[in-house]
Amino acid sequence: MKLEYDLDTYLEKINNNNSYFQTFINKDSLAAGVLVLKPGEEDTQTPHDSDEVYYVISGDGFLKIKDKDYKVSKDKLFFVAKDVEHFFHGNTKELKVLYFFGGPDS
């Protein structure tokens, strides 16, 4: 079982693929990964089956949760309950975010 993860490895995978996110832990009880949005890039995620926590590594913009926009900036944390509509938008700088699910990434 892998216990150590190098975030730069997963950021490079995103840079080399057509995806804007990379899940690097995907267990029954927990999933974790990183999301990178370039300025103006669309976040196409849909509601998840598990609660989720976001940690903003860098960048700016907004996280829309239901009908409210929350300002995104470095070192902010956000909680999104399962099955709740949410997405990042309006970033003028590259946005890097760690995400954690209370269950598998589905």
Predicted regions and their residues:
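A short, N-terminal "cap"/entry segment at the start of jelly-roll beta-barrel domains
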Residues: 1-30, 44
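Conserved short histidine dyad/triad with adjacent acidic residue
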Residues: 18, 33-48
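Well-ordered beta-strand scaffold positions
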Residues: 30, 35, 60, 68-70
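Short, conserved beta-strand element in jelly-roll/cupin
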Residues: 36-37, 48-63
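Structural motif
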Residues: 53, 60-62, 69, 85, ...
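Short acidic-glycine-tyrosine-enriched beta hairpin
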Residues: 68-82
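Ligand-binding loop in jelly-roll beta-barrel domains
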Residues: 82-106
